[in-house]
């Protein structure tokens, strides 16, 4: 199965590579190169990006900040990442628009659902920044929400591991990978894939989720083509 319209969720941490903080230009270039190939083949692609490479609301809250304030700072971090991705994509020849859930008209369009869909129909990539504009919601939940709004076929969660495991493979050599999971498997377990709100949104709207390794060149294209990479969450295909 080839997907026509895709919502790609990128964590902020993915953009920092091995640096430990900030944005690694080589990672942005690699992502842009993979995205350019799938868009050239006619796939409509929207991106939701996190901000954890710059600031994480939960960590700010744990350090004493008011949770809502910390989340707003995190939203602004996602906008920095979104603009950086736009630059990388356009340098790779991919027309790209940034839409933010918090208005900042000097650097981005406001989020307008119908306009986002129109951009996709014109083969432009749309990068959604500032989360969903409200505190207490993760960017994973934003990805599920935007996927439902734009009628995406699938949510791709591109991470540093090649799928969903029963425990952290970085810490446990005997970790077992799950190639297929139901929404309920994830909601009932403690697999740490996405928060329960994001999974429930995808379940309610019957949007499958594919979790795969972002750092394997060509994986975005393989996922778009429906190749069996990573882990798939959803009802049986």
Curated annotation (Swiss-Prot):
Subunit relationships: Homohexamer.
One annotated Gene Ontology cellular component of this protein: cytoplasm
Ligand binding (UMP): 51, 71, 132-139
Pathway: Pyrimidine metabolism; CTP biosynthesis via de novo pathway; UDP from UMP (UMPK route): step 1/1
InterPro entries: AceGlu_kinase-like_sf, Asp/Glu/Uridylate_kinase, Uridylate_kinase, Uridylate_kinase_bac
One Pfam family linked to the record: AA_kinase
Keyword check for Membrane: no
GO terms (BP aspect): 'de novo' CTP biosynthetic process; UDP biosynthetic process
SUPFAM superfamilies cross-referenced by the UniProt entry: Carbamate kinase-like (SSF53633)
Protein name according to UniProt: Uridylate kinase
Annotated residues for binding of ATP: 9-12, 52, 56, 159, 165, 168
Family recorded in the similarity comment: Belongs to the UMP kinase family.
Segments of this protein annotated with the region Involved in allosteric activation by GTP: 17-22
UniProt keyword terms in alphabetical order: Allosteric enzyme, ATP-binding, Cytoplasm, Kinase, Nucleotide-binding, Pyrimidine biosynthesis, Transferase
Gene this protein is translated from: pyrH
Chief localization: cytoplasm
């Amino acid at each position: 199965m080839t997907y026509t319209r895709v919502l790609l969720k990128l964590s902020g941490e993915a953009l920092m590579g091995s640096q430990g903080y900030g944005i690694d230009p080589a990672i942005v270039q690699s992502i842009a190169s993979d995205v350019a190939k799938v868009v050239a083949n006619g796939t409509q692609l929207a991106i939701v990006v996190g901000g954890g490479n710059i600031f994480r609301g939960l960590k700010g809250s744990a350090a004493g900040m008011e949770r809502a304030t910390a989340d707003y700072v995190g939203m602004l971090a996602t906008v920095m990442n979104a603009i950086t991705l736009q630059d990388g994509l356009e340098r790779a020849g991919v027309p790209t628009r940034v839409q933010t859930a918090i208005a900042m008209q000097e650097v981005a369009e406001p989020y307008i659902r119908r306009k986002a869909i129109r951009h996709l129909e014109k083969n432009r990539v749309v990068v959604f920044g500032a989360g969903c504009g409200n505190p207490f919601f993760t960017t994973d939940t934003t990805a599920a929400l935007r996927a439902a709004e734009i009628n995406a076929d699938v949510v791709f969660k591109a991470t540093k591991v090649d799928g969903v495991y029963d425990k952290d493979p970085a810490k446990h050599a005997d970790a077992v990978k799950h190639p297929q999971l139901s929404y309920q498997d994830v909601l009932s377990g403690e697999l740490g894939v996405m928060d329960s709100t994001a999974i429930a949104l995808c379940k309610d709207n019957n949007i499958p989720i594919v979790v795969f390794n972002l750092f394997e060149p060509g994986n975005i294209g393989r996922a778009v083509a429906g190749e069996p990479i990573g882990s798939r969450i959803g009802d049986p295909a």
